[in-house]
Amino acid sequence: MQPNEITFYQRFEADILAGRKTITIRDKSESHFKAGDILRVGRFEDNQYFCTIEVLSVSPITLDELTEQHAKQENMGLDKLKEVIKTIYPNEHESWIINFKLIG
């Protein structure tokens, strides 16, 4: 069995599978992905594989630079998006947006 290369909280699984969530915002430790990378995706809670994505782009961003468009790509409101990022990465000032598409 192949290992998963990126994980998402289980609460995001349905949105990813439905194509409603098309970006993820990560810290520097996950900024190494490149456009064209094909990634096996697992749930954070149990590492269970649930899909495969293709990375379309990776770019740095600060919390203040986030827009309603980013929030829409995350399938949530902008205030909620900023709150989630602050909760997951409380000490980070710069994050990376990984834009992806579901391929399987």
Curated annotation (Swiss-Prot):
Similarity-based family: Belongs to the N(4)-acetylcytidine amidohydrolase family.
ASCH domain segment(s): 6-96
Active-site residues, Swiss-Prot/TrEMBL: K21, T24, E74
UniProt superkingdom: Bacteria
Protein name: N(4)-acetylcytidine amidohydrolase
Function per UniProt: Catalyzes the hydrolysis of N(4)-acetylcytidine (ac4C).
Catalysed reaction equations from the record: N(4)-acetylcytidine + H2O = cytidine + acetate + H(+); N(4)-acetyl-2'-deoxycytidine + H2O = 2'-deoxycytidine + acetate + H(+); N(4)-acetylcytosine + H2O = cytosine + acetate + H(+)
Keyword presence, Phosphoprotein: no
Molecular-function GO term, any one: hydrolase activity, acting on carbon-nitrogen (but not peptide) bonds, in linear amidines
Keywords: Hydrolase
Pfam families on file: ASCH (PF04266)
EC code: 3.5.1.135
GO cellular component: cytosol
Organism: Haemophilus influenzae (strain 86-028NP)
InterPro entries: AC4CH, ASCH_domain, PUA-like_sf
